[in-house]
């Protein structure tokens, strides 16, 4: 067994002088700026701001903001799968112990753009169609008109229809779509409802929000494949889960 030399110990003690401080210059600069702006960040997770990745909460978004995180806590249309409404809360809670630096790239997103947590969509009533066709689009249309990019979190799949409708307002072109999912969600009515948890992207095509020929559905699997004929008939690119495993990520990209 070899004892550590005095020279090495001295070196280690020099490195230790910055203990409990942010030795990374990039991170220190970020935290210093946050403190100067009166916005203190917690690294322990116990006292963390409840915003997504501790982003500041701003209900009145402006053109100075670049990205807004928006929660859509809804699961009225997910028959037998209630609980998806807790998604936004869980995402915020789970993000508290991460950041501010991306551990792979070494970049700090909050230094590259102005990010806010808008909060959750407020529901005007308990009716699913109204929430999806009116409440959600209203929020995303407003944010889009101010030039913000949005990151939405559901909630069940029907929330995506509302997001697409809101973002489409004021745009002449239909969106291209990359969908990572187990199901295509292009079935017809379910229980008499045109917009439901399994028909989101069928209805989005019919209403002109997405272009099926520029839509790619990745990871499709399960016993309900016979319900997704609309995807194939309209020209969507459907890549099954088996294809992903057999051919790899590079093939998918």
What does each model-found stretch correspond to?
Residues 2-253:
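Conserved alpha-helical scaffold segments that buttress catalytic/binding sites
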């Amino acid at each position: 067994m070899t004892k550590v030399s005095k020279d090495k110990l001295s070196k280690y003690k020099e490195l230790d002088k910055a203990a409990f401080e942010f030795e990374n210059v990039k991170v220190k600069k970020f935290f210093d700026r946050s403190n100067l702006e009166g916005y203190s960040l917690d690294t322990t997770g116990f006292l963390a701001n409840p915003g997504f990745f501790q982003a500041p909460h701003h209900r009145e978004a402006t053109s100075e903001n670049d990205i807004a995180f928006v929660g859509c806590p809804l699961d009225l249309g997910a028959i037998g799968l209630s609980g998806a409404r807790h998604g936004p809360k869980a995402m915020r809670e789970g993000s508290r112990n991460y950041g501010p630096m991306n551990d792979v790239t070494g970049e700090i997103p909050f230094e590259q753009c102005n990010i806010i947590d808008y909060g959750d969509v407020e529901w005007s009533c308990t009716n699913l169609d109204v929430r999806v066709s009116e409440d959600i689009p209203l929020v995303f249309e407003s944010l889009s008109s101010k030039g913000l990019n949005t990151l939405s979190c559901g909630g069940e799949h029907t929330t995506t229809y509302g997001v697409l409708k809101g973002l489409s307002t004021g745009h002449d072109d239909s969106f291209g779509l990359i969908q990572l999912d187990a199901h295509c969600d292009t079935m017809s009515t379910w229980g008499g409802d045109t917009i439901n948890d399994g028909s989101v992207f069928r209805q989005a095509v019919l209403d002109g929000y997405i272009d099926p020929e520029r839509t790619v559905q990745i990871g499709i699997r399960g016993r309900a494949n016979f319900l997704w004929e609309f995807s194939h008939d309209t020209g969507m690119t459907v890549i099954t889960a088996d294809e992903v495993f057999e051919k790899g990520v590079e093939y998918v990209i």
